[in-house]
From Swiss-Prot:
<comment type="subunit">
    <text>Homodimer; the homodimer is independent of 2Fe-2S clusters. Heterotrimer; forms a heterotrimeric complex composed by two BOLA2 molecules and one GLRX3 molecule; linked by [2Fe-2S] clusters. Interacts (via N-terminus) with PRKCQ/PKC-theta. Interacts (via C-terminus) with CSRP3. Interacts with CSRP2.</text>
</comment>
<feature type="domain" description="Glutaredoxin 2">
    <location>
        <begin position="239"/>
        <end position="337"/>
    </location>
</feature>
<feature type="binding site">
    <location>
        <position position="161"/>
    </location>
    <ligand>
        <name>[2Fe-2S] cluster</name>
    </ligand>
</feature>
<dbReference type="InterPro" id="IPR004480">
    <property type="entry name" value="Monothiol_GRX-rel"/>
</dbReference>
<dbReference type="GO" id="GO:0005938">
    <property type="term" value="C:cell cortex"/>
</dbReference>
<dbReference type="GO" id="GO:0044571">
    <property type="term" value="P:[2Fe-2S] cluster assembly"/>
</dbReference>
<dbReference type="Pfam" id="PF00462">
    <property type="entry name" value="Glutaredoxin"/>
</dbReference>
<dbReference type="GO" id="GO:0046872">
    <property type="term" value="F:metal ion binding"/>
</dbReference>
<keyword id="KW-0479">Metal-binding</keyword>
<keyword id="KW-0963">Cytoplasm</keyword>
<dbReference type="GO" id="GO:0005829">
    <property type="term" value="C:cytosol"/>
</dbReference>
<protein>
    <recommendedName>
        <fullName>Glutaredoxin-3</fullName>
    </recommendedName>
</protein>
<dbReference type="InterPro" id="IPR036249">
    <property type="entry name" value="Thioredoxin-like_sf"/>
</dbReference>
<feature type="domain" description="Thioredoxin">
    <location>
        <begin position="2"/>
        <end position="119"/>
    </location>
</feature>
<keyword id="KW-0007">Acetylation</keyword>
<keyword id="KW-0597">Phosphoprotein</keyword>
<feature type="binding site">
    <location>
        <position position="263"/>
    </location>
    <ligand>
        <name>[2Fe-2S] cluster</name>
    </ligand>
</feature>
Amino acid sequence: MAAGAAEAGEAAVAVVEVGSAQQFEELLRLKTKSLLVVHFWAPWAPQCVQMNDVMAELAKEHPHVSFVKLEAEAVPEVSEKYEISSVPTFLFFKNSQKVDRLDGAHAPELTKKVQRHVSSGAFPPSTNEHLKEDLSLRLKKLTHAAPCMLFMKGTPQEPRCGFSKQMVEILHKHNIQFSSFDIFSDEEVRQGLKTYSNWPTYPQLYVSGELIGGLDIIKELEASEELDTICPKAPKLEERLKVLTNKASVMLFMKGNKQEAKCGFSKQILEILNSTGVEYETFDILEDEEVRQGLKTFSNWPTYPQLYVRGDLVGGLDIVKELKDNGELLPILKGEN
């Protein structure tokens, strides 16, 4: 009994509750050396209560990470500052800067994000020479993380300097497919990359791990029409939709995901699919407006959810219900019909 009480006490302390904007800002200042994960929650939402339990478990696994819960409606100034429009929402901070965000009750995704940020910022204690070697290997991996990598201040959605914003605009204008790294999220990378590539400023653009240059060089390449030949193009929407509809044998395009449907029709179709025992994957159309609108034309089907088997449209909820009632759904899902 005493041991159980002690364990409960440890779990309770592991997640800190913040009740004011001042307390939150103070916590950001104090926790600059560690990852800070903040859960914007509401006591009336059962999914938030569940995610608090998930946070408590993660806190046990990651004692060096600071986990915080903040009641969104009780501290509106913080919620408004970070554009919290629904609960649960999780924000990730490093060096007092927001580096990531997760909307919704997605326990596996929360766990993945925590693990990723912990590993990206952690270096084993070692000698200076080993640290330099480790950093060099890490920078090599980062510059090769995608065919085209942009190291910038902020993110493509929220650039935090004019040069980074201009760079993103040029890449988007030329339909260039790229991934990005926010140098504000990692001071070691920010300083190390300057030496690694012998380039003192940001943003920096890499293709196949090789430095192309900063904004001025990219502007020159754009003017000479060389940029399109150097950087990889993003796939056209139709090609992207073909890939998405064939991503799994059974693909459901819906509002929300398996864990949390965000409309009644999507919830009903999930229940039907779950009852079949057939494996399937989902795509949340609320997270990608281009896919949401494009798929309507691509398949000539104006509403959601939409179910695909091996890339072919089966239909929406009404058709899936009919197929189930006729005993035809399972053979179709298994590719037998």
